[in-house]
Amino acid sequence: MTITPQHLIALLPLLIVGLTVVVVMLSIAWRRNHFLNATLSVIGLNAALVSLWFVGQAGAMDVTPLMRVDGFAMLYTGLVLLASLATCTFAYPWLEGYNDNQEEFYLLVLIASLGGILLANANHLAALFLGIELISLPLFGLIGYAFRQKRSLEASIKYTILSAAASSFLLFGMALVYAQSGNLSFEALGKSLGDGMLHEPLLLAGFGLMIVGLGFKLSLVPFHLWTPDVYQGAPAPVSTFLATASKIAIFGVVMRLFLYAPVGDSEAVRVVLGIIAFASIIFGNLMALSQTNIKRLLGYSSISHLGYLLVALIALQSGEMSMEAVGVYLAGYLFSSLGAFGVVSLMSSPFRGPDADSLYSYRGLFWHRPVLAAVMTVMMLSLAGIPMTLGFIGKFYVLAVGVQASLWWLVAAVVVGSAIGLYYYLRVAVSLYLHAPQQPGRDAPTNWQYSAGGIVVLISALLVLVLGVWPQPLISLVQLATPLM
């Protein structure tokens, strides 16, 4: 095939982030300078975000048989880039106190972002696998970045071994799907699956193995066992990336696969996904109830959030609103998670050993950092799905989609899960306003709101509130992000 200037414009975000990786590599080789490499990374990610406007002007197209650039890909690419940008911003003050190599952190985040962009544009099972590996491999290093901390190293080893096992399941599943259908492209799969082939045992086994692999990456029950330990052990900025960029990119590509190849038409697949969604919602929320570590709590809550999203995925064949629901929910989840993990990062910076992730560290925060406590409260209310926040709009969409598709037992699970979630989110929010302990632990810097990380956290809180009251701009944006059929 011939690569035209139009194709290059369509690939701009991928090319810009790739070029930034090379520039940062050369910069590290030439001279170690933490500020320079952090600045180069942030400039590259901002340039990639700006380039999405030019991609939109170029229109939707298939760049290669592996990649399709359309409104859907642009939305998910934008969300991944925002999460990567926030991760780099939170990491800078944290790394200031880190005595080992600081610069490689940005390199790993950029390479993982490349994987996220590839996943957002993937239109082929080979691109899906390449993207997942490209986002997972840098995470092995990022999770164990504070390798002198026992928990960080343990989390990295745990994630590496389990991730390798999940990837092998995913690859074997793809092989079985290919053996039965003879296709790897999403669209070609859709055409071949339309002939009553969905009942073939080999194909169902292939999709079953793929669900195991993807379920691990999305930390769905029962493939979730790594999640709380890894969230707790990883440095706070890495937990931010893990909770947002990697989940959004992988869910985006699964959404596209289900859209083109009507896998959800199979009753067996729908039942299995329904059970996984139900278990993720209930188990994730119940396990979060007893947590006293805020990163573990957010880890368990992310399991339940992916369960809510799975309800919209199961309802995908029932109506157009499912895609809108997923887009709005993921945007709300992104900003709420960035704010919550951003507060933990600010409290844990600069690096001084373990993060400030104990709930006790946040007790009475309001009395000496009132704005930071207010931001954390807004994020907890949004994650709980309280009205006037963006989280409520997303949860309302999911419930509407579930009702539209007559998934009554999953709608009941969402309602019960939200009620349980309200308890532990409010427990975090209330502890911020209790009497401060006699010997306060870690604290955010006095001028935190003037730092780049502080600005990101404040913008996230503002977006959660403004879009919670007036969600139309976000809904219009998500409606524009339609995939090329």
Swiss-Prot record:
Superkingdom per UniProt: Bacteria
Main location as per UniProt: membrane
Compartmental location: Cell inner membrane
InterPro entries hit by this protein: NADH-Q_OxRdtase_suN/2 (IPR010096), ND/Mrp_TM (IPR001750)
Entry's Gene Ontology cellular component terms: plasma membrane
MF annotations from Gene Ontology: NADH dehydrogenase (ubiquinone) activity; NADH:ubiquinone reductase (non-electrogenic) activity; quinone binding
Catalytic activity: a quinone + NADH + 5 H(+)(in) = a quinol + NAD(+) + 4 H(+)(out)
Residue spans crossing the bilayer: 8-28, 35-55, 71-91, 105-125, 127-147, 159-179, 203-223, 235-255, 271-291, 297-317, 326-346, 373-393, 408-430, 455-475
Record keywords, A-Z: Cell inner membrane, Cell membrane, Membrane, NAD, Quinone, Translocase, Transmembrane, Transmembrane helix, Transport, Ubiquinone
Pfam families: Proton_antipo_M
Any GO BP: ATP synthesis coupled electron transport
EC number: 7.1.1.-
Membrane topology label: Multi-pass membrane protein
Biological role stated in the UniProt entry: NDH-1 shuttles electrons from NADH, via FMN and iron-sulfur (Fe-S) centers, to quinones in the respiratory chain. The immediate electron acceptor for the enzyme in this species is believed to be ubiquinone. Couples the redox reaction to proton translocation (for every two electrons transferred, four hydrogen ions are translocated across the cytoplasmic membrane), and thus conserves the redox energy in a proton gradient.
Family of this protein: Belongs to the complex I subunit 2 family.
PANTHER family the record matches: NADH DEHYDROGENASE
Subunit (UniProt): NDH-1 is composed of 13 different subunits. Subunits NuoA, H, J, K, L, M, N constitute the membrane sector of the complex.
Cross-referenced HAMAP family: NDH1_NuoN_1
Name of the protein this chain belongs to: NADH-quinone oxidoreductase subunit N
Lineage: Bacteria, Pseudomonadati, Pseudomonadota, Gammaproteobacteria, Enterobacterales
